[in-house]
From Swiss-Prot:
Superkingdom of source: Archaea
Organism lineage: Archaea, Methanobacteriati, Methanobacteriota, Stenosarchaea group, Methanomicrobia
A Pfam family per the record: UPF0147
Name assigned to this protein: UPF0147 protein MA_0092
Family per similarity comment: Belongs to the UPF0147 family.
InterPro entries membership: Ta0600-like_sf (IPR023130), UPF0147 (IPR005354)
Amino acid sequence: MTAKVIQMSSNDSAEVIRQCLQVLDSITSDSSVPRNIRRSVNEIMDILNNESEPLFLRAASSISILEDISNDPNLPLHTRTLIWNLSSQLETIPVDE
């Protein structure tokens, strides 16, 4: 049995980034999210929008910050779920782009 490798095109990766930025924007406008979390989310948005860095590096940096803030005890549950979903989406971006 052979495994199929699914290649993600750069358009797919760009769409993942676009969708993640939309969710991140909604988190920053949610007043129930603590200010320190919103600051971190703004930092992630800046990282993802920085096109001078390779896409996989931007995704990895963002995932690292998302992991840190997902452990914050003051994070509302609905936001924690969004953050886990964002991490999962960013993990789909291939390293070789």
